[in-house]
């Protein structure tokens, strides 16, 4: 009994309490539901990405007075026996993408808004379940909250996606200095980590019906961002080392698909586990406040 009452005094006790709370709140089941919603949201998101590629290609064709064939010659300087066939396939696919960009947009926008708002609605329900709070906001307010998080997330993701382009453009300007280049790359990594932490912090602060203390939300956001970055880099390492485009149905590519599904589930589980971390940190803060009050 005394050991259970003093769980907050040792790191092992905190970890044990967090895992027990995860089991009590059915975190594995909730993570499966969130993974399914995330995969559904990814489908119209890919459609919108293809539409964006079509608009970008059309913009290049219009501004530079080129056709698709000439544009591909600049982008894909292929050589070898198979280059002609690959070039024809790429030209046909890109031409079809340019023609279908309008239809892809009309299809992708409503589906993306629907499934992404459904995803954040699921996150809202899961957060309320973990934090033991009922949804006391009216339904229109709750749905507007979900949609606002959709646009905030899209804005942060686009800003984060622009970092590799900024890194590539500024690589030549930095020169050959190792220390300067390393510091610049490290600063970009910190900015990317800051984007992830900021996104998770906003999710913890906006979506639940019960407002968390900002310090508790920040601890959970950092935990979730660390788990996301570690999982992303491990998966990218596997893709770089083993995945090949020569044979789509190779064993390595099939394993990559399985690992992607596992990665999605792992990220959903880590997100919900970070909610439990927030709850445990809040309990520790209350225990310490009670000890100070009684002392």
PLM regions with names:
Residues 1-295:
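Membrane-embedded alpha-helices and immediately adjacent juxtamembrane helical segments
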């Amino acid at each position: 009994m005394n050991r259970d009452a003093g769980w907050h005094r040792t790191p092992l006790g905190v970890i044990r309490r967090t895992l027990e709370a995860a089991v009590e709140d059915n975190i594995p089941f909730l993570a499966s539901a969130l993974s399914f919603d995330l995969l559904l949201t990814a489908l119209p998101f890919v459609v919108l990405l293809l539409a964006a590629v079509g608009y970008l290609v059309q913009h290049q064709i219009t501004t530079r007075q080129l056709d698709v064939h000439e544009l591909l010659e600049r982008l894909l300087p292929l050589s070898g026996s198979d280059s002609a066939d690959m070039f024809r396939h790429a030209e046909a696919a890109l031409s079809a993408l340019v023609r279908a960009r309008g239809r892809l947009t009309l299809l992708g926008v409503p589906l993306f808004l629907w499934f992404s708002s459904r995803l954040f609605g699921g996150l809202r329900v899961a957060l309320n379940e973990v934090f033991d709070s009922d949804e006391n906001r009216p339904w229109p307010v709750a749905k507007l909250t979900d949609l606002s998080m959709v646009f905030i997330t899209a804005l942060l993701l686009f800003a984060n996606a622009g970092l590799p382009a900024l890194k590539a453009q500024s690589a030549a300007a930095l020169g050959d200095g190792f220390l300067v280049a390393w510091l610049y790359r490290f600063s970009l990594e910190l900015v990317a980590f800051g984007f992830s932490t900021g996104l998770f912090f906003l999710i913890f602060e906006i979506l639940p019906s019960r407002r968390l203390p900002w310090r508790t939300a920040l601890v959970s956001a950092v935990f979730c961002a660390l788990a996301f970055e570690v999982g992303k880099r491990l998966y990218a390492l596997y893709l770089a080392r083993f995945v090949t485009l020569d044979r789509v149905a190779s064993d390595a590519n099939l394993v990559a698909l399985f690992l992607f599904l596992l990665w999605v589930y792992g990220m959903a589980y880590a997100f919900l586990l970070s909610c439990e971390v927030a709850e445990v940190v809040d309990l520790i803060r209350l225990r310490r406040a009670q000890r100070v009050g009684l002392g």
